Amino acid sequence: MSKLAQECGAINLSQGFPDFPIDEKLSDLVSAAMRNGHNQYAPMPGLPSLRGAIAAKVNGLYGFSYDPDTEITVTAGGTQAIFTALGAIVHPGDEVIIVDPAYDCYSPTVELFGGRPVHVRLGVDMRFDAEAVRRAITPRTRALMINTPHNPAGTILRDADMRRIADMLRGTDIILISDEVYEHLVFDGEKHASAIDYPDLRERAFVIFSFGKVFHTTGWKMGYALAPKELMAEFRKVHQFNVFSANTPMQHALAEYLKDPLNYQTVPGFYEDKRDRFLIGLRTSRFEPLACEGSYFQLADYSRISDEADTEFAKRVTREFGIAAIPVSVFYKDPPKDQRILRFCFAKQDETLDNAIEKLCAI
């Protein structure tokens, strides 16, 4: 859709990336690291200073201390961390439960390592359906993948959901991969429920995070993974021969930038304001917005406008009205046939959002 948006000169609310500048303090830190000669390979698991800063951040947020030497690895983005975690644990014939709609890297990665993706759907109103997941578990289930806040749904897992997941995995050897790259994009006073908060989950989980989502630097491809040392040892075996190490000057910059918690504590309010701005405008259109509790994605039902399939409707809206969005069916293995939903990214400048709303109200 980004390609079509470019061809049509449309406002691009399809792909999930910000269109505003990053904090100058952060870009200055990167420049300083380069000028100071930090331009060669970093240690394979990441700079000790950055791993230490991550450990301090995690402990401050969740009250649990990961060992920076054995339980934290810096990665080339969240997607690489997911790829590496799956590569570390999936063997031919293993089953991995994926909750649709799902980020599009999950299923192909499972298949690449010889596993079999087992798809279940979110329930009513894009909520986690614990019973559907429970029914999908078999003796061959190797892992369960969860995502909160959720892309593309914009919903979050709450304490009750996490406890249900812990209950269903207790007594099994199933590994949890918890994709939490939008951890700081949780709105309306809700608390991010991380797998880290639950000992029964934490002891079996790879927990994945992204600096790009938090600090508006998606092009840097910087993230990190947390896991118990036994799991992390397997993770690093793949990581070493996949990327070896992530970008060195950016690691130096992030290690320094994390020292001020305000640099991530202000993120929820920043994006909640953008969510609200877009949502207020969207409610004046013929689209029906779904609940957005986190992430920077807003779903909207267009059933009152058209009965076209979402892929065709999304293309037509881009070509005829100059606004690009993602059809949600592409995030499913087997999309619901009566679903008419588009995903919009509101990680944009206010002017961009206002112009987008004007176009959406014309549909």
Regions from the PLM with identified roles:
Residues 1-77, 84, 257-259:
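N-terminal small-domain helix-loop-helix segment of the aminotransferase-like
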Residues 87-146, 159:
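PLP-dependent aminotransferase-like
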Residues 115, 171-174, 201-203:
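A short helix->loop->beta-strand "cap" motif at the edges of active sites that frequently abuts
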Residues 124-190:
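Active-site phosphate-binding strand-loop segment of PLP-dependent enzymes
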Residues 198-234, 249:
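Active-site PLP attachment segment
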Residues 235-240, 257-280, 307-309:
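Structural signature of PLP-dependent enzymes
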Residues 255, 271-279, 289-302:
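Conserved glycine-rich beta-strand-loop-beta hairpin in the small C-terminal domain of fold type I
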Residues 316-325, 331-363:
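PLP-dependent enzyme catalytic core of the Aspartate aminotransferase-like
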